[in-house]
């Protein structure tokens, strides 16, 4: 029997959501550039859904926002929580209208394996623990990336980027003896350096998700 040339199947994907709280395109562009300068590879080519729940004006420049994002190699696939007139505008420029989903009743499958790295992770290196947790017995240097579908434990200083719950596991955590990271992310929610610097507990801590926000708690040394 000949295989059909196409098949339509249901599936789900984890997308980052960009919340827009201003109508000033210059301000949006400047703030976006500052974030991209800190972690360019993390955002490069990232598909985004734009949340416009904070925008109450019908003359919002959606096309201008799209151009700002695409010119920086970010891919806007749709918008959510927007006014009806903005939804109509989105359809006219080829963007999807994404409905806010209900909280998932089933969490992603728990990690099955643990990857252990018994050395420092140096600048330019990327370590990925697929379908499992990642344990680094050593430091993660500036410019290095550690990624896991589960949790990340660093028995040393975390100075690079750490992305846990990469497959959507919201129960994942990031634990490190010293957190001086360029970026930390759990299931798509992220903090950059400035957020961590504001939190004194981050010297030795555990980062986790509470709702849609990251939190950090100090650990005994």
From Swiss-Prot:
InterPro entries on file: CAP/MinC_C, MinC, MinC_C_sf, MinC_N, Septum_form_inhib_MinC_C
SUPFAM superfamilies: Cell-division inhibitor MinC, C-terminal domain (SSF63848)
Coiled coil: none
Keyword Cell cycle: yes
Cell membrane is among the record's keywords: no
UniProt family annotation: Belongs to the MinC family.
NCBIfam families: minC
Subunit structure: Interacts with MinD and FtsZ.
Name of the featured protein: Probable septum site-determining protein MinC
Species for this entry: Shewanella piezotolerans (strain WP3 / JCM 13877)
Gene designation: minC
């Amino acid at each position: 029997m000949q295989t059909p040339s196409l098949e339509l199947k249901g599936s789900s994907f984890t997308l980052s959501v960009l919340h827009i709280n201003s109508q000033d395109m210059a301000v949006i562009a400047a703030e976006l550039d500052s974030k991209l300068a800190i972690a360019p590879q993390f955002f490069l080519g990232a598909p985004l859904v734009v949340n416009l729940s904070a925008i109450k004006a019908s003359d919002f420049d959606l096309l201008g926002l799209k151009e700002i994002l695409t010119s920086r190699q970010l891919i806007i696939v749709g918008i959510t929580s927007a006014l009806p007139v903005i939804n109509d505008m989105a359809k006219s420029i080829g963007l999807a209208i994404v409905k806010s989903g209900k909280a998932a009743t089933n969490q992603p499958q728990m990690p099955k394996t643990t990857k252990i790295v018994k050395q420092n992770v140096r600048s330019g290196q990327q370590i990925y623990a697929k379908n499992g947790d990642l344990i680094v017995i050593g430091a993660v240097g500036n410019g290095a990336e550690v990624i896991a579908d589960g949790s990340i434990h660093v028995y040393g200083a975390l100075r690079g980027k750490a992305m846990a719950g990469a497959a959507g596991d919201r129960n994942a955590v990031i634990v490190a003896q010293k957190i001086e990271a360029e970026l930390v992310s759990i299931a798509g929610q992220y903090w950059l350096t400035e957020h961590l610097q504001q939190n004194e507990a981050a010297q030795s801590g555990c980062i986790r998700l509470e709702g849609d926000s990251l939190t950090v708690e100090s650990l005994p040394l």
